[in-house]
């Protein structure tokens, strides 16, 4: 009877002690700042850690006068599986100790390390402490399933050893959290690290961290991959999952070269088949995207959308020398070459210079003698397909651009402008007029120097712009 009562009393006391230990543990973790991820969720999915007794590993030989209150960890055990969770701590004045001092401190019996001393102990242990003194390599580091890397540093994390590289990174002025648990176990991420970054009071204990060999970063892992990453080591995971690596990682496998798509005509190389498809109209001359206002054709739909701004009469970019306005700043920059007399594109056949590369390419087609685009009605051939498109308006009697002075119609806006400059440049009969002309079409004033004339545009075509 007495023995059973004593056994039950001992069981109750042990249960209370375990609850108090768990309460102290949660209090220590809850002292940190609010995290970007839920610690409770991480701890609920993480297996209960087993304890590995380490005799006098975390004992310090620090002088008694140099002691300051800080976060103290029980020196009797180190968790075998430690989650990558930031832990709150207080600063202490001690910065670092050498390997000899560390070995000496392990012999002496002194109060336990504070947080920074414990961290420096782990750093030195990774460097020159005898590997046989503590078999850490057989224990695995467990990571959380959800990690927000940017939010982690935004909270004021002291350091981050994950793929830090060789960049000079300085911690913020006030540091109150850091993932110190990640340095205690033999993490397979760093089999032969050069040095680690550890920040204490805005000072770098070591300059850099060796990059992760396979180039895996937080953004490269999906949530499913990250869960798998916890259960299996990165070595076994790298054999099953192909990560997105860049050229800056020298250890990338030769078999992970990106696919290339080569143009059979000019030999130009592209990294995607879509880019090759967009390139092919350069050789075929196809311009499937045609402006319904002026009939000009384009190879890409995005270029057509930019072209439609021309017909909206919005030209905020003005030339300081002649006052001519443009709808795009790039067009204004090209226009300034006219005043400077700069013609960088020179034809190698006739020596004619051009301000724009597009005009230079169109001019070169006149020397080739190849007119592969022919009209099915009159068999007239053209160098480019959009010229054939304009020509087809002559057979359909579609001339949307009409001169208000003489009533002559044109298929293209460019032809109307040229007609006005040659014949009606000095005529001001219709200057400043708006409304409906003699043909009953809507009038749009010319935006350039031919402001005394108007472009007569069909209402049906004008509606198709918007």
Swiss-Prot record:
Free-text function comment from the UniProt entry: Transcription repressor. Involved in the development of the forebrain region.
Protein location: Nucleus
Name of encoding gene: fezf1
Zinc finger C2H2-type: from-to: 261-283, 289-311, 317-339, 345-367, 373-395, 401-424
Protein name: Fez family zinc finger protein 1
UniProt-listed PANTHER family: FEZ FAMILY ZINC FINGER PROTEIN 2, PR DOMAIN ZINC FINGER PROTEIN
UniProt GO molecular function: DNA-binding transcription factor activity, RNA polymerase II-specific; RNA polymerase II cis-regulatory region sequence-specific DNA binding; zinc ion binding
Region entry Disordered, spans: 446-466
SUPFAM superfamilies the UniProt entry points to: beta-beta-alpha zinc fingers (SSF57667)
Gene Ontology biological process: cell differentiation; nervous system development; regulation of transcription by RNA polymerase II
UniProt motif Engrailed homology 1 repressor: location: 34-49
Family: Belongs to the krueppel C2H2-type zinc-finger protein family.
Main location: nucleus
The UniProt record lists the keyword Repressor: yes
Cellular component aspect of the GO annotation: nucleus
Keyword Membrane recorded: no
Organism for this UniProt entry: Xenopus laevis (African clawed frog)
InterPro entries (alphabetical): Zinc_finger, Znf_C2H2_sf, Znf_C2H2_type
Keyword vocabulary terms for this entry: Developmental protein, Differentiation, DNA-binding, Metal-binding, Neurogenesis, Nucleus, Repeat, Repressor, Transcription, Transcription regulation, Zinc, Zinc-finger
Biased composition (Polar residues): 453-466
């Amino acid at each position: 009877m007495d023995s059973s009562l004593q056994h039950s009393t001992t069981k109750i006391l042990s249960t209370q002690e375990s609850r108090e230990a768990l309460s102290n543990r949660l209090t220590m973790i809850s002292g940190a700042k609010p995290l970007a991820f839920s610690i409770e969720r991480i701890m609920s999915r993480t297996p209960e850690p087993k304890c590995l007794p380490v005799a006098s590993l975390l004992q310090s030989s620090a002088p008694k006068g140099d002691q300051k209150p800080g976060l103290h960890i029980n020196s009797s055990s180190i968790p075998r599986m430690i989650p990558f969770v930031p832990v709150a701590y207080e600063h202490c004045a001690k910065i670092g100790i050498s390997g000899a001092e560390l070995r000496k401190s392990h012999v002496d019996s002194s109060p336990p390390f504070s947080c920074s001393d414990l961290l420096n102990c782990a750093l030195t242990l990774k460097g020159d402490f005898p590997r046989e003194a503590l078999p850490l390599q057989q224990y695995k580091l467990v990571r959380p399933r959800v990690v927000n890397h940017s939010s982690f540093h935004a909270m004021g994390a002291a350091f981050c050893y994950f793929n830090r590289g060789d960049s000079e990174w300085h911690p913020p002025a006030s540091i109150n959290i850091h993932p110190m648990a990640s340095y205690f176990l033999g993490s397979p991420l760093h089999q032969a690290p050069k040095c680690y970054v550890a920040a204490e009071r805005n000072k770098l204990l070591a300059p850099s961290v060796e990059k992760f060999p396979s180039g895996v970063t937080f953004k490269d892992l999906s949530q499913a991959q990250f869960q798998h990453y916890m259960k299996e080591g990165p070595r076994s995971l790298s054999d099953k999952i192909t990560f997105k690596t860049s050229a800056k990682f020298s250890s990338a496998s030769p078999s992970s070269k990106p696919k290339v798509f080569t143009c059979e005509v000019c030999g130009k190389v592209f990294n995607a088949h879509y880019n090759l498809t967009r390139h092919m109209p350069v050789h075929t001359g196809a311009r499937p995207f045609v402006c319904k206002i002026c009939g000009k054709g384009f190879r890409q739909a995005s270029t057509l959308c930019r072209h439609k701004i021309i017909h909206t009469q919005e030209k905020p970019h003005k030339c300081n020398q002649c006052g001519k306005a443009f709808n795009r700043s790039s067009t204004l920059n090209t226009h300034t070459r006219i005043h400077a007399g700069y013609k960088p594109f020179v034809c190698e056949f006739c020596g004619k210079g051009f301000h724009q590369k597009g005009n230079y390419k169109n001019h070169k087609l006149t020397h080739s003698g190849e007119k592969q685009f022919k009209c099915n009605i009159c068999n007239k051939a053209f160098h480019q397909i959009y010229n054939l498109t304009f020509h087809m308006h002559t057979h359909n009697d579609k001339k949307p651009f009409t001169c208000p002075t003489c009533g002559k119609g044109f298929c293209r806006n460019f032809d109307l402008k040229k007609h006005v400059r040659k014949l009606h440049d000095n005529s001001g009969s219709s200057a400043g007029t708006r409304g409906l002309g003699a043909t009953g079409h809507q009038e749009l004033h010319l935006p350039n120097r031919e402001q005394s004339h108007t472009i007569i545009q069909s209402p049906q075509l004008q509606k198709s712009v918007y």
